[in-house]
Amino acid sequence: MHTHIGIFAKHVSRPTPEELFEAVAGYGFNCVQFNAACLGIPSLPDAIDETLWRRAARAARSAGVKVVALSATFNLLDENKVRLADNFRRLELLAQGATVLGTDLVTLCSGTRYQQDMWTYHPGNQSPAAWRDMTDAMQRALNIATVHDVYLGIEPEVANVVSNAQDAARLIAELDSDRIRIIFDPANLYRPPADPRRDGYVITNALLLLGARVAIAHCKDVADPNQAAHHNHSGLYEHVAAGRGILDYGHYVSELKRLVPESVPLILHGLTEEQIPASVSFMHERINEIATLQRSQTSEDL
């Protein structure tokens, strides 16, 4: 059903690219979302050492691991215009690095008015001015993507300007570019009072809107807010490793199969290396359950 199951490469820390990709394969993964930090350099590097990047590409191929995306996230609403301009320069470098690694997908963050952390909510994110600033910056990123023949992976995230599936659909319509792809993470779409245990419509409606553009499906979980360790005064859910929370993964996997045209890579993240085996087992169990159910339904229809 899903032939590509992988992980954020940063969750597996090893001193060399060869050891990194061997470890990734050893956990049963056949793909990764890569980050330049895995090469011992900044996530937004100042330069591209092609020898180092080619070495990483060879190591991935040797281990049988496909690089399906390269992270290039920075705050598109950075109020420090000098730093923002420099980050666009670094984005262009990463577009080149992605090509060396054999992927055409570079992931971005749509940004926030909160200046200390690009993944933290700010009430100004919903303003028309924030939307204009974000689309202007996104167009600049699209121009870079066009030059280097890569695609931009945008993730709807409650803490950012593109905070839900409707925002993502609006962005695609307004910029009218085939180079926008969606990184789909249902854990990032739930905001109380919507409950991941019962409100599967959040996933279904989002995939009905965006399914044709989904390039990667992220897999983390929503922490049970009733547990003291995850009581959050921000009004948002906290996240845990896949299988340790309350997200209905059976519904998620079945809707991916139903509404996404091709089998997109499932990428685990938001976990420690020690949690990887349990989360991998959990994902395979859900995938096998859905496959068995679908075979049973097919037999009944014959």
Feature annotation, model-predicted:
Residues 1-104, 139, 177, 181, ...:
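N-terminal pre-domain/capping segments
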Residues 24, 112-121, 225-235:
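Short, flexible, mixed-charge acidic loops at enzyme active sites
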Residues 44-55, 82-90, 122-133, 159-163, ...:
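Alpha-helix N-cap and loop-to-helix initiation/capping positions
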